[in-house]
């Protein structure tokens, strides 16, 4: 039995090798399915300097052009995409057009529009328009159990501010009976 499994395993590896390296393989001629989710890097600016992130080393800061962002969103929907993430290397709440991006994603028909944030800028003034635009979830990257750890990880003493913002978002969501994930 062991020898049979070894042979099947070896044959499987040989078949994979042939598919990968043989010129007549269909591996490189087939088109993979369009992804279910797209992530738009709407900006690459951040208000924190987390020790694990490459962002503090970026020497050029920019934002994604609105027309390009909306066109990419449209292409995603046209190709069967269902989820839209509005973040990547930057802090989404540094982007003044964030509510517009969320609203456009929902208008186009994305089932799930979300963002990740360090939470320091997710103030009621900035978060309310994003929530009201239809954001399906806001994920907080707190990365710490207490104030001291937070400062060590994030490079700033914003722990109290982040927890206040998180609490406000929970309260607003619950008071308005909004179906939105907060993580």
Predicted features by range, described:
Residues 1-57:
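N-terminal pre-core extensions flanking Radical SAM catalytic domains
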Residues 58-183:
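Radical SAM/AdoMet-radical enzyme domain recognition
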């Amino acid at each position: 039995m062991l020898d049979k499994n070894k042979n099947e395993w070896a044959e499987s590896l040989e078949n994979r090798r042939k598919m990968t390296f043989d010129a007549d393989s269909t591996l490189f001629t087939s088109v993979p399915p369009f992804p279910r989710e797209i992530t738009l890097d709407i900006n690459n600016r951040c208000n924190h300097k987390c020790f694990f992130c490459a962002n503090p080393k970026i020497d050029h800061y920019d934002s994604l052009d609105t027309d390009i962002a909306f066109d990419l969103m449209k292409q995603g929907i046209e190709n069967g995409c269902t989820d839209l993430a509005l973040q990547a290397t930057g802090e989404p709440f540094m982007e003044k057009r964030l509510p517009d991006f969320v609203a456009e994603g929902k208008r186009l028909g994305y089932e799930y529009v979300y963002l990740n944030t360090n939470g320091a800028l997710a103030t009621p003034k900035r978060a309310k328009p994003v929530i009201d635009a239809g954001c399906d979830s806001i994920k907080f990257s707190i990365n710490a159990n207490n104030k001291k750890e937070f400062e060590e990880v994030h490079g700033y003493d914003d722990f109290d501010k982040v927890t206040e913002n998180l609490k406000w978002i929970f309260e607003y969501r619950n008071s308005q009976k909004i179906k939105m994930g907060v993580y």
